[in-house]
Every structure is written in C-alpha cells, then in structure tokens.
Amino acid sequence: MAETAGSSGQGGGAYICFEADCSDSDTEVDSPVQCSDSSDEDLVDNANIVPGNHLELFQTQEKEAGERQISLLKRKFCLSPGTSEVEELSPGLAGIRISPPKRNPVVRRRLFDAGGRDAVRTPRDHEVNSSPEPRSQVQSGSSSRSWEGHLESINEPASDGNMAAVMHKLFKTLYIAGFGEITRVFQSDKTNNNQWVIAAHGASEVLYAASFEILSKHCSYLQASRKVHETGSMSLFLAVFNVGKSRETVRKLISGVLNTPCSRLLLQPPKIRGLCPALFWFKLGLSPATQTHGTTPDWIKQQTNVAYNTGEASKFDFGTMVQWAYDHRLTEECKIAYQYAKCAGTDLNAKAFLASTNQARLVKDCCTMVKHYLRAEEQSLTISAFIKRRCDNATGKGSWLSIMNLLKFQGIEPINFVNALKPWLKGTPKHNCIAIVGPPNSGKSLLCNTLMSFLGGKVLTFANHSSHFWLAPLTDCRVALIDDATHACWRYFDTYLRNVLDGYPVCIDRKHKSAVQLKAPPLLLTSNIDVHADEKYFYLQSRVKTFYFKEPCPASDTGEPLFFITDADWKNFFERLWERLDLSDQEDEVDEDECSQRSFTCSARNTDAMH
C-alpha cells in the first residue's frame, strides 16, 4: 500500500474508494461456494415442498421413450398424410403430379399396415391413419383407396405367390415330401403329357369321393389320397390319362370336378426317373386311406424292384447297342439316339445308356460301326443275293404291270428294257450306264427314283462337282442315279468320268479318309439332252444306252400322276423276270439251316443274354 493511502485530504471517502472491491455480480450471495463456506448456515432445508404425481411422470417418460424407439424402427414404413390437406383444399390440384408416380407400391409397408389390428398404435400412426383418405401409390395417379380395400387386397386368398407358398408348405407338412421333389416342371400350359400329379387345396370330402369315380373313367391308372390339417385339407392325385392332356385341360377338368378355384390347384408331371419319387408313390399306395384304379405304371414297378437297381443291371454294354442298331438297320445318328432312348423303359442297357455322360460319343461310334458292318455285308453279296434281300425287305402287294404300262405308254418295248437291264445290273463294261431322255413331265424321274428306292441306291447331285468328294457316295452303294443331267454334266463326264460310264475301276477320294479304288457301280441318268444326236459327245455314245420318253405323263385333276410305282411293284417285277434277267437261283437253294442257325452277332454277350 502506498504511504499516502487514506490521507488524500478528502476525509474518510478516499479510504472507502480505495479499499472497496468492485464486483458487478448481484447473485454472489446465492453462490453455492459461498454458502458452503459459511459455517453459520443451517444444512436442513425447511422450505415447503409442492407434492406431485411421480408415478404418472415416470410412465409418461417411459411411454415417450418407447414411442421414439418404435418411430425410429418404423420410420421407413409410415405413410405420409401429405396430400390430405391439399385434397381438402382443391381436389383438382391434388391430381397434378410433377414427378411420375412409382411403378410398384412399397410392399414392405403392407406388413405394418396389415398388422395394425394387433399391434400397438402409436400417436404418429393414429395421426397418419386418422387422415380422411390415406395415400396409396397407384400408377394412374388417381385418388387413393380406402383402408378397408387395402386390407382386402392384402388378405385376398387368390394372391398368386402367397397361395402357392401356402399350398407347398401345407403339402410338405401333410406328405413329408415336397411337391417339387416328386414332380418335374413344365413351363408351358400347352405341353401335352398323359401323366399328371394334381394337388387340390380345400376340396370337400364329398366332392373328393365323387371325383375318384369320375376321374377313373378318364385314366388307365389313378391314385388318390386326402389328408386334413388344422390349416386346411389337401387332395393328391396321380393320374395316367388314356390320352395326352395339357395342364390347361387338366386344370379345367379338376376344377370342375372338385369345384375348386384354379388358383388352389398344383399340377405338374411326375418324376419318372429316380428312386425317391417311385418309393413315395409306392408307399402311399400301400396306405388303406389311398384309393387306386388300374395297373401301376411300369416306371414305379421297375424302380421299386431290387433287381432293377443292381450294379450288374445298370452296366452299359456298347456291343449290345451296336447289335440293336444293326438289327434295325439304323445308320443315322439322330435315329439311333432317339429310338434307343425310347427303349429305356424295357431295355436295361438302354437305361444305362441314358445314364451315361458321353451319349453323343457312343451314338457316333455306334453309327460308324453299323455302317462298317452293313457295307462289308453288302459288298460280300452277289447282285442276285442283293436283289433277293431287297425283295424280302419290300412289303405289300404290287403289280409289275404298272411298270410295263409306263414303258408301253412311252413307246418302249418292255423286252428291250429288260434286255438292257440284265447287263446293267451286273455292271458289264460298256453297258454300265442307262440314260432316260425326254421332255419335261414325261415320267423319267418317276421310273428312275422308284428303282433307286427299291435297290437302295444313292443319288448324286452335279451341283457339288466342284468338291473332290461329290462321288464319295459311290463307295457305299450298289447302284447310283444322276437326275436331270445338263450340258455341263455331260461335258464333265466326257472330260473326266468316261471310265465311270464304262463300269471300270475308279479311284474315289473321301473326306478325312484315304482314297479308295473300286469298280464303278451301275449308273442311271435322266436328261433332256440326247447325247446320240450331238456330235460333240461322240465318245459317250458307245458308253450310254438310251431310252426315250417322248410323251408327257398324264395326270389327274388334282395333279397326281396316273402312273404310280412302288417298291412292291418292283419286287413283283424282279420276281416275275428273275430268269429273264439271268439272276442266279442260289437264293432259292441256299442252306436254310445255315441262315437260321445264327445271324450276324456284333455283341460280346451270348445270344441268350441279349435283350
């Protein structure tokens, strides 16, 4: 402190101004620090307390906390009443949309909307649902529907996915196995099948009993059963109809018989491959509550047979397949695959073939082997034996007069045609080619193509002559035909293929194989060009025997030719002229015991083991 403190000469006022501590707080007296520092203050508060309802306050706070949690949980699902005020002010203004409406309604909201009957309604829910017309998202932008209509659309029984899920769940509950485990899927309702699995939900017991009698008239086999659950009943049918029916037809039939909506029906064809589906129907058929009609399908019998599922029975033998294709004379891969697959119901080896993972390679190899066997067998036959076999393969009755009448109509002496046919069949040099020449529609192709069909010959197309392999079919046939030869074709023969017309050995190139040398088979040609009348084909005239068809072939009013020749007609033709054609009689005198003793076998299994 300064020496002159308090002695400014102004009396005691200077002391007060100097020693005073300035503070602008008026609440310092009430400071809790100063109150606590006071030792004279009483620690007991004797002020009057205002009584309150603490329990009600606690409940209110708990309720608000719960509502906040529910609101956070449902914030994405609450409907907004935003358009209600606009609709009250101006309905026309409410119809105006700047942004396009959503295509699909928010399906997740339905969960909370439909559950509102049992759920606790929050004040926000009450505020939303108490609006005059809750908003509904629609594509057309029209006014929203009522709350009751919204609930009806949700709880509608015919709801597609909902009803199907309920029926599948009920089916699995009652029958243990799922409906998809015993059936396969047909995507189209138009696909025909004679076997169907039908599950009907909610059919009455009286109609179920009557339906068995009605459906048994349409089916060769029918198995029916009905089970009841607290959530509904389920009727199950395995129907094998007398004729194939589509799902649409079966649905209409069952819906009319059971008086059940189509939405409460499940229809799919049964799984016919697999042990589990077969055991399901077999076990269900043993139940006394199951009604059956007719004979059990073969696929159930076979797959529930112990011997049918043994390892030895399911072993595939390639030789058996080749033997089957050889016996049926099948040389096309598509026919071998299709026809052998159809035998899987009765042939165990065919069933094992379907279970194989390399069917394409097996079919290709089988086709190749059959072609090798048939080609070697055909080449080992004489022309007489070959024609005899073709006659045996021809079916039906025919008349050789249809061929003779066509020749006479064209002014050809039948005896001249037969005399030319005799060396042609034997492939005698200089007599190896016969040409039928004449104007269009004179029956040239009719005569030649029917003869090729009977003899199993090949047809060559000159359009492929630019390829080195266009003559490759000559290696697999006994006779051949070139239809409608033009000047280009005759010039090509005159330049390159004179020895083919002669009937001498030729070398033929084959694709992906080495060239083969063989005797040229007898050749038939049809043409509008007479090589004997043109000097530039002088070197072909001695190699070609020509017959002229000068008259147009008559036809009926419908355009059908009056001359009609079949394989049976050619069969009768060769049988009647067998000796005239100088064909040997060895086929009539052949040792029948040798032929009947054993046919050609290309399977490793013995004859008794083959199916």
Curated annotation (Swiss-Prot):
It is an enzyme of class 5 (isomerase). GO terms for biological process: DNA replication. ATP binds at residues 438-445. Residues 146-313 are annotated as: DNA-binding region. It comes from European elk papillomavirus. This is Replication protein E1. It is found in: Host nucleus. Can form hexamers. Interacts with E2 protein; this interaction increases E1 DNA binding specificity. Interacts with host DNA polymerase subunit POLA2. Interacts with host single stranded DNA-binding protein RPA1. Interacts with host TOP1; this interaction stimulates the enzymatic activity of TOP1. Signal peptide: none annotated. Residues 135-146 have a biased composition (Low complexity). Belongs to the papillomaviridae E1 protein family. Phosphorylated. Residues 412-562 form the SF3 helicase domain. The modification Phosphoserine is found at residues 80, 84, 90. A motif (Nuclear localization signal) lies at residues 74-76. The keyword Hydrolase applies. InterPro entries: Helicase_SF3_DNA-vir, P-loop_NTPase, PPV_DNA_helicase_E1_C, PPV_DNA_helicase_E1_N, PPV_E1_DBD, PPV_E1_DBD_sf, Rep_E1_papillomaV, Znf_lg_T-Ag_D1_dom_sf. ATP-dependent DNA 3'-5' helicase required for initiation of viral DNA replication. It forms a complex with the viral E2 protein. The E1-E2 complex binds to the replication origin which contains binding sites for both proteins. During the initial step, a dimer of E1 interacts with a dimer of protein E2 leading to a complex that binds the viral origin of replication with high specificity. Then, a second dimer of E1 displaces the E2 dimer in an ATP-dependent manner to form the E1 tetramer. Its main location: host cell. Keywords: ATP-binding, DNA replication, DNA-binding, Early protein, Helicase, Host nucleus, Hydrolase, Isomerase, Isopeptide bond, Nucleotide-binding, Phosphoprotein, Ubl conjugation. Residues 112-154 are annotated as: Disordered. One of its GO terms (cellular component) is host cell nucleus. HAMAP family: PPV_E1. Its EC number is 5.6.2.4.
